[in-house]
Amino acid sequence: MKPIWDKGKPVNELIQKYTVGRDREMDLMLAKYDVQGSLAHITMLQSIGLLEKDELTALSAGLKDLLPVIERGEFVIEDGVEDVHSQVELMLTRQLGDMGKKIHSGRSRNDQVLVDLKLFTRDRLRGIVNSVKSLFDILIKQSDRYKDVLLPGYTHLQIAMPSSFGLWFGAYAEALTDDMLLLRAAFDQANRNPLGSAAGYGSSFPLNRQMTTDLLGLESMNYNVVYAQMTRGKMERNVAYALASVAATISRLAFDACMYNSQNFGFIKLPDDCTTGSSIMPHKKNPDVFELTRAKCNRIQAIPQEITLMTNNLPSGYFRDMQLVKEVFLPAFQELEEVITMTAYMLDHIKVREDILSDPKYDAIFSVEEVNRLAREGMPFREAYRKVGAEIENGTFKADHNIHHTHEGSIGNLCNDRIAARMESLTAAFPFSSIDAAISRLTSK
């Protein structure tokens, strides 16, 4: 098939292969959203007189027929076809003749791929939000379950003060609430309509941009047509930062889990079927899941920088550099969802040791408790600090394992209910139901 930009001159196959690259492979992920965007666009075209009602009916039916094909994984971009936009138009043209070519009126592939990317991102962020919430629920459950089980707290990898599994699980739960804030900001950037910006400078057709915004359930539009094109790359980068924030939280948790599972710490134990073995050492039970999770999370954290390097030296307007952003951006959602799902599974099956601080080597961890006790009894804090320090040095310190932390967020007052309420408020604010209603109206037969 000739490219849709064909002007009647021979196509250099070497150039064609190089410029298309992996675009057909990547664009398969966008097929459903290309159909949704096209349905909104042709509905708007009919409203301004660029399509007849019978043409809209035929084109809509043809587009809607593609959706189950896409859902079944049977949609393909044929050899010689550049991208998903060209494939959809080709299929309509085969079915409807020249009428199929009318769907491109008032539109460029620039704003077409932009809306595809935004609809894709909006949808996949929803999956991430739901997965993060599921992981959060398990962390809160485990925090409540093990709230009274003490754990050494570390600074500089030196034993520091008493902590608890309640604090440890709860810390990562609250971390996810801040990550959710970034996911919401990313979602809001994706939930704006670039359709009508065409190649980046608008159209002489009297396009109704508000109509396509409403039909797609988008919150608003990218008003300035030049800026609409400038969101290409920027939107992906900022969304990638939100994904990276989630990945950073999980990566840190994975490191803790690997360390706590080692024999030198022995704070947690993984079920045998959640570990792997060695080909030479029969005693090994390796935490490979958490190690791979850590590596995958670090790879995800590199994506914003990779996108930045592709886009940070470009002036306004569209450039083909943007095509390569899809290769690192589109697959990131599935990888992060798999990471979150596996992390939730592992944490739900983890076993904790309940007598860790009974080991005398951790006695010094209670030194601050003793300093504070002496200070409460009237001894100046610095004098109490020196007294307890001297006792530790000469081996006369007697640890009192009874701790009394009552302030908000401490061992004795985790505030998990408040943390859970914050997460509930954040997730409830996503407008998923209104989006579902809009897309259902648009795509129903």
Give each language-model segment a name:
Residues M1-G202, L207-T213, S220, T276-G277, ...:
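A helix-coil-helix interface module used to build multimeric assemblies
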